[in-house]
Amino acid sequence: MQAIILDTETHQLNGLPIEIAYAPVEVNQAKLSLDRQQMFDQLYSIGEEKISYASMAVHHILESDIVGQPHYSSFKLPAETQYIIGHNIDYDIRTIALCGVNTTPIKAICTLALARRAWPDLEAHNISALIYHISQGSEQARSMLKGAHRADADIILTANILMHILHVLNIQDIESLYSASEQARIPQTLTFGKHRGSKIADLPKDYVQWLLR
């Protein structure tokens, strides 16, 4: 498995993983293929820690769901993983690092950053908003989103978003996707101050000098 889409659910914000899911993908000639037969989805126990109610309200994983499940430290990435794709993927990579996974050599591909580059004028770029956008507010999108915020469902939703990103940005292969993700992480517009919404390249020189002080 060279590339996977991965998602985690945690017991609290920036917490321990209580669910991890991933599926292998390939990118070839701007087309995405996902192998559902090799999808991995596992709940994990976290010792004496308790799931916060705020997190429970998001993913609906209860304490009773993780009783008797493997300890989170048992999680291993599939062999030969080079690329990990996900929405706000840095969060998930930090999470699996808590399992003892060496994430240093991993190339992270962030669909959140890519979506902001592909559709800069959208009001929101979370998974649900993007699914409604690419489906033009269809009933099918509503049905798909009923399982959102569980790791396995978010894998499929992220794959749907990525398919459209590949088309919009004309990305042909996985390494080009990684390069585009890295580039997309660099802000193009200012998000604060009197020049909020302005392109960084168009900012007055004196304002840029003030920012750099």
Show the residue positions of the predicted features.
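Conserved non-catalytic scaffold segment of RNase H-like nuclease domains
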Residues: M1-A108, A113, P120-H149
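Acidic, divalent-metal-coordinating active-site segment for phosphoryl/phosphodiester hydrolysis
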Residues: H11, R150-I161
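Generic preference for hydrophobic/aromatic residues in regular secondary structure cores
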Residues: P17, R36, A118, L177-A184
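Charged, amphipathic alpha-helical interaction segments
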Residues: H60, Q136, I156, N160-M163
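A residue-level signal for conserved active-site and pocket-lining positions in enzyme catalytic cores
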Residues: I85, D154, T158, G197
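Active-site catalytic microenvironments for nucleophilic, acid-base chemistry
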Residues: C99, R117, H133, I161-V168
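Short runs of predominantly hydrophobic/aromatic residues within well-ordered alpha helices
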Residues: T111, I127, I155-T158, P204, ...
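Acidic two-metal-ion nuclease catalytic site recognized across multiple nuclease folds
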Residues: I161-R213
